[in-house]
Amino acid sequence: MERVENTARLVSVYDDLLFDLPKNIEVSWYNLIEILSGEEIFEQRYKVKDERNVVKFLLADDTNSSSMLSSLKMVRENIRTTRDAVPKETWELINELDLYAQQNIKQGINRSERHLFLNTIIEGCQKIIGLFAGAMSRDSGWHFLIMGRYLERADMGTRILDAAVSLMLKSEPEARIQLGQVTWSKVLKSQSAYLDYRRTVRTSINGAKATTFLMNDPCFPRSLAYCLGQIGEAATKLPRAGLITAKVDKLLEFDYPINSSEDLDEDFHNHLNDIQIAIIEINHQITENWFHFRQGDAA
């Protein structure tokens, strides 16, 4: 569910960004494929790296297991097989959302109605997430749900930042000031962070401060620090959590100084990549720890 929402957010922010950029600044949609590490699968399916093919790949392609429709299909199957553990209204809501997405996917692929389509998907996801929050017992099922949600959110949050940084690095130096003003405002809005940033940071928006907020703010529910904290807290409510919490704590302790927009360079891009690898490792450890566990395994 988190992946469905975040994919919609990613496409939406990129669409908004390209719409607002000055005409003399050229940006490729294929950047999104690179950020999501989907080059190999994409190039097996498409010869042209244009907007339509990229958006179709991210939203509708059934050969892409991370596409929005593929993710919705997996969510629907997961809810079908766990109906006894989730609120009974969930099955109806996911069916409605899945049906809407399938019947209206052309709106998402075509530019003219994309914004409305993606907003409807995001709202549908938030409705289901709100139902979980208000009606699920805080037992082991809830804690696994929280870990999965915030792992996905942390991963996609770093990829959205990476998309912005890559966009800035690929632009001409003389265009970066103008580009930065648009880019970082859109990034904050894509994470529903614009007002929280203005209230918390209380300065004009720039790359360094926006990135620091989305990486380190302890209270904002889409910041990397908050997501990792939620993963660690949920893990402690389950048995054999030692390896998980150790990996989370190690990631939380690593501080990357960002003093100016010049620090958002290739080294920072590599830092984000390292975080994504660490998140994948935490995900694998969760699988090994609780789903492939054998009596006598260390944890």
Predicted segments — roles?
Residues 1-299:
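Alpha-helical transmembrane segments and their helix-helix packing motifs
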